[in-house]
Amino acid sequence: MILRVKVKPNAKTVSVEQLEDKSLKISIKSPPVNGKANEELIKVLSEFLKVSKSKINIKAGKSSREKLVEIYD
């Protein structure tokens, strides 16, 4: 499964919401420095989707706020 994710780094609170276009908007506390935001994104997604972090891969957009995230079965 591939998800379109819009990430908001440096947020005050962590949240996940589904947008009208079926993508997810995820607010995270980490800054977009040295991959910290991507690490927190994977952690938040794994908790939200109840899957292991090892089953989540950022397929595209590692240095962008808009990402394609692949979830393995």
Swiss-Prot record:
GO cellular component terms listed in the entry, alphabetical order: cytoplasm
Coiled coil (UniProt feature): none
Species name: Hydrogenobaculum sp. (strain Y04AAS1)
Similarity comment text for this entry: Belongs to the UPF0235 family.
PANTHER family given in the database record: UPF0235 PROTEIN C15ORF40
SMART domains xref list: DUF167
InterPro entries, per database record: DUF167, YggU-like_sf
HAMAP family in the cross-refs: UPF0235
Xref: SUPFAM superfamilies: YggU-like
Name of the protein described by the UniProt record: UPF0235 protein HY04AAS1_1378
Pfam families linked to this entry: DUF167
